[in-house]
Structures are given as C-alpha cells and as structure tokens.
Amino acid sequence: MKQIFIGIIRFYQKFISPMTPPTCRFYPTCSHYGLEAFQKHGAFKGFWLTCKRILKCHPFHPGGFDPVPDKKDDKVNS
C-alpha cells in the first residue's frame, strides 16, 4: 500500500510540480517529506504525517526546517 502512495508522490514530483512555481515554506519540501514519511513509517502513519504537514503549508505558518520524525522503537530497553 505504501508503494501506491510513493508512486503518487513521484508522479506529482515528475509531472505536476515542474509546471508550478516553488511555493513550499518548508525544508524538505512537502513532497520530499511525504516520501520520507512513507518510507520510514509505512502507509498509515506516513499518510497521517504527510496530511499534517500539508495542512501546515500555508502563508500564515512561518515554515522552516521540519524533518520527518524518527521511528520510535516499540521495544523497552532494560
């Protein structure tokens, strides 16, 4: 399932993004953030993180450096 989302993002990057001026307020860009989120966290959490990021990408948010959070280890280290 995550490969479908990654394919959609890559399609956007290759065919749609070059036709529009760069407007993302963040680094990495929202599409690169989405790719990394899906690769690190899988389909469900990657989708959630990408949606949250896209909703923050508007003129009233200052933007800046906003990396994908690291995957938390579910194991408890003793």
From Swiss-Prot:
Sorted UniProt keywords: Cell membrane, Membrane
Superkingdom classification of source: Bacteria
Ribosomal protein keyword on record: no
Subcellular localization, as worded in the UniProt entry: Cell membrane
UniProt topology in membrane: Peripheral membrane protein
Entry GO CC: plasma membrane
Pfam families linked to this entry: YidD
The keyword Manganese is annotated on this UniProt entry: no
NCBIfam families linked to this entry: membrane protein insertion efficiency factor YidD
Protein family: Belongs to the UPF0161 family.
Cited function: Could be involved in insertion of integral membrane proteins into the membrane.
Protein name (database record): Putative membrane protein insertion efficiency factor
Source species of the chain: Bacillus anthracis
